């Protein structure tokens, strides 16, 4: 951030002002559960072509997606794009902490592990074991040059905040 604008560092180390025109991409196809991750590189490449054609230059994803998404983004940006698509990568915490306490040490450690998984995946250095309701697999595509930013957290419901506050007075 410079003044009131975003800047993005190019691969050669120079900085350009970035006016983000973006698109959100979910984890699944319409009509599927959000935990049924898309695993087609070609489908993502097709989407990236359409996203670029409509004038967008950034993509936001709500959570770590399947490895195929990042492979497709690396391929598209390196091979197809006149201008690369940049990524806002959200790091989604577990939704149901034990006893509803977002400040519990176990919950905090789980979230820190998720942050490590996501950052390692963005650098193409992650092997994430199979897990329920989350993306997993071998992440070998280094898309770190295309990261516009990390979005840490998610919206919390008022009831969740109240429960956490009740368990952590002061």
Segments (PLM) and residue ranges:
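Active-site-adjacent substrate/metal-binding segments within catalytic domains
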Residues: 1-78
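Active-site region of glycoside hydrolase catalytic domains
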Residues: 60, 78, 82-170
């Amino acid at each position: 951030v410079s003044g009131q604008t975003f800047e993005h560092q190019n691969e050669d180390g120079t900085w350009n002002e970035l006016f983000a025109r973006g698109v959100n991409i979910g984890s699944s196809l319409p009509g599927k559960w959000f935990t049924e991750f898309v695993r087609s590189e070609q489908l993502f490449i097709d989407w990236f072509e359409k996203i670029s054609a409509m004038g967008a230059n950034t993509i936001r994803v709500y959570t770590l997606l399947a490895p195929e998404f990042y492979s497709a983004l690396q391929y598209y940006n390196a091979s197809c794009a006149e201008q690369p698509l940049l990524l806002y990568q959200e790091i989604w915490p577990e939704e149901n902490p034990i006893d509803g306490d977002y400040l519990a040490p176990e919950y905090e450690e789980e979230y820190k592990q998720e942050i490590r998984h996501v950052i390692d995946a963005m650098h193409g250095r992650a092997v994430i074991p199979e897990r329920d309701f989350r993306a997993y697999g071998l992440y070998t595509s280094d898309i770190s040059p295309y990261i516009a930013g990390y979005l840490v957290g998610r919206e919390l419901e008022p009831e969740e905040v109240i429960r956490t506050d009740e368990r952590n007075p002061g």
